[in-house]
Amino acid sequence: MSHVAAQPVVRNARWRAGRVVTIAIATMATGLAWLLGRLAHVDYIVDTPIGTRKITLALTIVATVAAGIAGWLVIALLERYTSNPRGVWIALTLVVLVLSIVPVFRTPAQLDTQLMLAALHCVAAAVLIPALPQRHTTATGRR
């Protein structure tokens, strides 16, 4: 009996480990993209309502991890309560991606900074959108 009960625990641990790895990969990818931008002399300076702000590597890493954790929460809820979590996830995240990029181009900054910040959003999305959903039984019992 304990052997049967251990099966879901192992599977859940794999899902969690897979999602942690996904967030780590997204973080490394955005960090690398940020560094490539710096090598290309992008200054990452933006004017905000509270003053001029430099988008640092640390800020990029924290933002990516935060987006990954938020995405994990959303996909977990979708997997629990919807019959098509992957479809809803993809539609929702693409809308969020577009809505996150629009303000980048409305913020006063050099064009190379704006383009690189938009690229950073796309890099994180390129990893998180396809990789966070995991195959398992949904709320309706389907895979």
Predicted regions: what they are:
Residues V42-T52, P108-A109:
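Membrane-interface helix termini and inter-helical loops of multi-pass transporters
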Residues I50-V62:
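Short aromatic-rich membrane-water interface segments that cap or initiate transmembrane helices
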Residues T27-L39:
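Alpha-helical transmembrane segments of multi-pass membrane proteins
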Residues M1-W15:
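Short, Lys/Arg-rich, polar N-terminal cytosolic tail immediately upstream
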Residues G18-I23, V123-R143:
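Membrane-water interface at the C-terminal end of transmembrane alpha helices
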Residues V102-M116:
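Membrane-helix boundary connector in multi-pass membrane proteins
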Residues G18-R19, A76-L97:
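Internal alpha-helical transmembrane segments of multi-pass membrane proteins
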Residues L59, A63-R80:
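Canonical alpha-helical transmembrane segments
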